[in-house]
Curated annotation (Swiss-Prot):
Tissue expression remark: Expressed by the venom gland.
Compartments where located: Secreted
Family as reported in the entry's similarity comment: Belongs to the phospholipase A2 family. Group I subfamily. D49 sub-subfamily.
Active-site residues annotated for this sequence: H48, D92
Cofactor remark: Binds 1 Ca(2+) ion.
Disulfide bonds: C11-C71, C27-C117, C29-C45, C44-C98, C51-C91, C60-C84, C78-C89
Keywords carried by this UniProt record: Calcium, Disulfide bond, Hydrolase, Lipid degradation, Lipid metabolism, Metal-binding, Secreted
Function: PLA2 catalyzes the calcium-dependent hydrolysis of the 2-acyl groups in 3-sn-phosphoglycerides.
Enzyme nomenclature, EC number: 3.1.1.4
Name under which the protein is recorded: Acidic phospholipase A2 PA-1G
Major localisation: secreted
InterPro entries, alphabetized: PLipase_A2, PLipase_A2_Asp_AS, PLipase_A2_dom, PLipase_A2_dom_sf, PLipase_A2_His_AS
Gene Ontology cellular-component annotations: extracellular region
């Protein structure tokens, strides 16, 4: 679920940036998304959105699905349980790892999506 996703982000980025800083970043980080991603981090969000879309096609509810995971060496690791839980956990874990590798550009936070996306 979204709270677990936030915790995964903190695991992967070693708590270096609050989760809320990713909620209104670029064209895809946060609710919805459209246009061309502004950078690598925004592409991580686009991929995460697409993954959630695939989860929904499988009949899962990714924003609400609870799953089991651990933070091991700043890497989110999913604990297999059931199809929806595994799929959503993998979406979130891959996004959290992607966020940790991508550069955060302050100029891409809270942008005007109508003109830039």
């Amino acid at each position: 679920n979204l709270i677990q996703f936030g915790n995964m982000i903190q695991c992967a980025n070693k708590g270096s940036r609050p989760t809320r800083h990713y909620m209104d970043y670029g064209c895809y980080c946060g609710w919805g998304g459209s246009g061309t991603p502004v950078d690598e981090l925004d592409r991580c969000c686009q991929t995460h959105d697409d993954c959630y879309g695939e989860a929904e096609k499988k009949g899962c509810y990714p924003k609400l699905t609870l799953y089991s995971w651990d933070c091991t060496g700043n890497v989110p690791i999913c604990s297999p349980k059931a199809e929806c839980k595994d799929f959503v956990c993998a979406c979130d874990a891959e996004a959290a790892k992607c966020f940790a590798k991508a550069t955060y550009n302050d100029a891409n936070w809270n942008i005007d999506t109508k003109t830039r996306c």
